[in-house]
Amino acid sequence: MSALILDGKALAKKTEDELTQCVDKLKASSGHTPILATILVGDDPASATYVKMKGNACSRIGMESLKVEMPTSTTTEQLLAKINELNANPAVHGILLQHPVPEQIDERACFDAIALEKDVDGVTCLGFGRMAMGEEAYGCATPKGIMRLLEAYNIELNGKHAVVVGRSPILGKPMAAMLLNANATVTICHSRTQNLEAHIKQADIVVGAVGKPEFIKAEWIKDGAVVVDAGYHPGGVGDIELAPLADRAAAITPVPGGVGPMTINTLIYQTVDSAQKKLG
């Protein structure tokens, strides 16, 4: 069999077309344009590139991106003050604090200062807790993007055994919670897991979120599994050895073009949703 390609790039483009119409309607009905505020602290080139990509995504659908740049010397107190200022600004519908921030800043305190209704990147503890409990909150952009991709391709999760490899607070942990909420049976594996291969061999769905190139070997994955690779490394490879799975897996997310496009797309999607709730 040939694996179904879960094309995140195509889905992101389709969603952008739909979001453009939503934004046009909001502008016409309310006279306001949805705004995503992005905060970049310091001059890390990779972070600057990510912020630019998010700004470009906003432009493509007619949204505005409010870019807030702060120096590397910024203190926790100064960053908290800026976040509170954006929280209080009714024209701002979403707030993104670009990770990582300089080491002197308490990143967790700053994430948690973002108002729940503007936490469109799903980074607050409150938002994570509400999401895990099945209450209304915006999900972390990457795992939420994965869930949207699986849903778009009608991948069955109910009763399936999903193995998530990785436990980061912005990917592995929320991914496991979202899969659990979708009635999957979930196993979380990490750097201290013993017999990792044995766990993965049992999986109907494998999510690679470990941050190491091709760490998960193709022979560990059973025939007919759904394979989701959330990694990206130089050379265009992910966390999973994908090539040998092209004719064994039921479905795979390509690298690049699978999970990656869905991350920024979900951030924009959730910002438009926040604006719709505010502007009607």
UniProtKB/Swiss-Prot annotation:
Subunit-level organization: Homodimer.
Protein name per UniProt: Bifunctional protein FolD
A GO CC term attached to the entry: cytosol
Entry superkingdom: Bacteria
InterPro entries listed in its UniProt record: Aminoacid_DH-like_N_sf, NAD(P)-bd_dom_sf, THF_DH/CycHdrlase, THF_DH/CycHdrlase_cat_dom, THF_DH/CycHdrlase_CS, THF_DH/CycHdrlase_NAD-bd_dom
NCBIfam families: PRK14192.1
Annotated keywords: Amino-acid biosynthesis, Histidine biosynthesis, Hydrolase, Methionine biosynthesis, Multifunctional enzyme, NADP, One-carbon metabolism, Oxidoreductase, Purine biosynthesis
Function description: Catalyzes the oxidation of 5,10-methylenetetrahydrofolate to 5,10-methenyltetrahydrofolate and then the hydrolysis of 5,10-methenyltetrahydrofolate to 10-formyltetrahydrofolate.
Family statement drawn from the similarity comment of this UniProt entry: Belongs to the tetrahydrofolate dehydrogenase/cyclohydrolase family.
One GO term (biological process): methionine biosynthetic process
EC code: 1.5.1.5, 3.5.4.9
Binding site for NADP(+): G166, R167, S168, S191
HAMAP family in the record: THF_DHG_CYH (MF_01576)
Cited Pfam families: THF_DHG_CYH, THF_DHG_CYH_C
Any GO MF annotation of the entry: methylenetetrahydrofolate dehydrogenase (NADP+) activity
Catalytic reactions of this protein: (6R)-5,10-methylene-5,6,7,8-tetrahydrofolate + NADP(+) = (6R)-5,10-methenyltetrahydrofolate + NADPH; (6R)-5,10-methenyltetrahydrofolate + H2O = (6R)-10-formyltetrahydrofolate + H(+)
Pathway note: One-carbon metabolism; tetrahydrofolate interconversion
